[in-house]
């Protein structure tokens, strides 16, 4: 099942969820950002469920530009800075597992 198909199933019945072109753009965006985060050229199948979660969140925030909270009694808006931040532990675990499997250690100079 493709990433787009997973997202379409999760968003089934939601308004504007039938716009495959918009969903594909969001799938591509999520895929690229996750690949950059984990330093892999392609999205591993193991991380596709996370990518689907990210796309659903991006879709639901499309019209809100990443608003995390709003107050009704006063005008107050907080924006989400990094939608992938909540998955950092999973990404780190993936990278560690890949390093262990390959037997290579990565040294980074600051």
Segment roles from a protein language model:
Residues 28-35, 52, 56-60, 64:
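Amphipathic alpha-helical core segments of compact helical bundles
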Residues 14, 18, 39, 54, ...:
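Generic preference for well-ordered secondary structure
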Residues 1-49, 93-110:
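Conserved short "hinge" loops at termini or chain/domain junctions
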Residues 57-110:
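Short loop/turn elements at secondary-structure junctions
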